[in-house]
């Protein structure tokens, strides 16, 4: 599967111009199979932008260039074009990156995703009893955002550094970036 993201305040208009207005009704993290000019895709309401957006999952990798051209043309009426992920916006918004902000030991309740869990599933679902127990007892860890005292911009990125207090490890720093808006490391 080859993903392409259409993000930002004009994404609804651009994606609707390609697929139709039904995309505006997609709830966040929902998806629908569709096609454009015979190219099979999955359209998902998701992405790395606090401004909202879509991810288009190409099911036939040989059609990547054609799909790119379709959306490049679709963006012209709104004067938009190719961009890149914005790490600062993602971190300021609290959007998670699997493997960057989480690992195989992270559970949904630690990262504010518990509300998306259906805990009323059968006992045959792998891990459901463990998740029910964590929900009942509460998670041992919580992910949260920090504003750091460091005056100079730190090197951004995925870091997984220990957070120490009085000689004891109290947490992990999983990501950091200089926020121009806050003029602080977050």
Residue ranges and their predicted role:
Residues 1-186:
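Conserved, structured C-terminal
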């Amino acid at each position: 599967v080859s993903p392409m993201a259409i993000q930002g305040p004009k994404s609804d208009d651009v994606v609707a111009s390609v697929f139709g207005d039904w995309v505006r009704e997609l709830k966040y993290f929902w998806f629908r199979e569709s096609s454009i000019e015979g190219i099979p895709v999955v359209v998902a309401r998701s992405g790395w932008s606090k401004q909202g957006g879509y991810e288009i999952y190409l099911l036939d990798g040989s059609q990547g260039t054609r799909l790119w051209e379709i959306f490049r043309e679709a963006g012209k009426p709104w004067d938009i074009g190719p961009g890149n992920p914005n790490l600062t916006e993602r971190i300021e918004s609290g959007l998670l990156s699997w493997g960057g902000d989480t690992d195989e030991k992270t559970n949904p309740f630690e990262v504010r995703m518990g509300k998306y869990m259906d805990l009323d599933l059968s006992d045959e679902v792998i891990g459901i009893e463990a998740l029910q127990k964590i929900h009942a007892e509460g998670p041992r860890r919580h992910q949260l955002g920090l504003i750091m005292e460091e005056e100079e911009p730190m090197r951004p990125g995925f870091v997984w550094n220990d957070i120490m207090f009085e000689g004891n490890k109290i947490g992990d720093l999983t990501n950091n970036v200089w926020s121009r808006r806050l003029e602080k490391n977050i």
